[in-house]
């Protein structure tokens, strides 16, 4: 990718905003012994939809705009999150995608999370004497960021041990005092909001899995209904996934041939997956809660439009499913 826009430079002002206005956003700010800043967006405090919206923009490296509106697509669930970015590959895959596996300890006392956000673009490791990105994806993106501060988002319900934050800071070549960790439990308002704000990201991730040339994706928008939270983790996770699988809509603007765009449109919707047809919590239970047994092609929006800017043609595929969304969201 030739675009060297900095996901950390663009997201830091939003991080600072969360800290400055933590009171009105119902957040809690703490400092770990190593100096790392921790923003609790729903563990010991209520958090808020607005906090989730802003955290979603941080996840996108400050390169996306996320808004909340009401639409009439789903009569019972009018609250809708809208996402747009003019840098879809870097914003969604180079920052928002939760691709950094972080862990410490073992068993029920251990800590495990997938890191999302701009810190991913800075993180490196030494392999065979050479420095390389922590995630292989960045080699494909040909993207690496550098900045004086960074932030990472974790969808967890407990504070990570200081050892995990030390690891993140080391990988980013920063002192821990220049790292901010943002915590968004799945069952919280902010957590649900920032997950559904990934409606465009899941489309980019699936396009990558389908081997569509990422450099040909030049702009993108998406929207999905905001689900009601649920105190049970599995049900909360199910609802956030279903908001995208059954209610997500994405519009990609691409370069290249009409044939490639039409193929992408036809293969993108969640309905092409073998596991489509029931709420995600039910699918997950059938696989005995083994996430890796779920068909990876399921994680995608319900309906898509792919517009080829070279010809002006648009290709439509998939559709939203009100009945399945109702089964997932409840009364």
Swiss-Prot record:
Catalytically driven reaction(s): 5,10-methenyl-5,6,7,8-tetrahydromethanopterin + H2O = N(5)-formyl-5,6,7,8-tetrahydromethanopterin + H(+)
One record GO biological process: one-carbon metabolic process
Role noted for this protein: Catalyzes the hydrolysis of methenyl-H(4)MPT(+) to 5-formyl-H(4)MPT.
Gene it is expressed from: mch
Protein localization: Cytoplasm
Species of provenance: Methylococcus capsulatus (strain ATCC 33009 / NCIMB 11132 / Bath)
Name of the protein in question: Methenyltetrahydromethanopterin cyclohydrolase
Record's keyword annotation contains Hydrolase: yes
GO MF annotations, alphabetized: methenyltetrahydromethanopterin cyclohydrolase activity
Keyword Cytoplasm: yes
Enzyme Commission no: 3.5.4.27
Similarity section: Belongs to the MCH family.
Main location: cytoplasm
The entry's keywords: Cytoplasm, Hydrolase, One-carbon metabolism
Gene3D superfamilies membership: Methenyltetrahydromethanopterin Cyclohydrolase, Chain A, domain 1, Methenyltetrahydromethanopterin Cyclohydrolase, Chain A, domain 2
Membrane-crossing segments per the record: none
Pathways per UniProt: One-carbon metabolism; formaldehyde degradation; formate from formaldehyde (H(4)MPT route): step 3/5
Pfam families referenced in this protein's UniProt entry, alphabetically: MCH
CC annotations in GO: cytoplasm
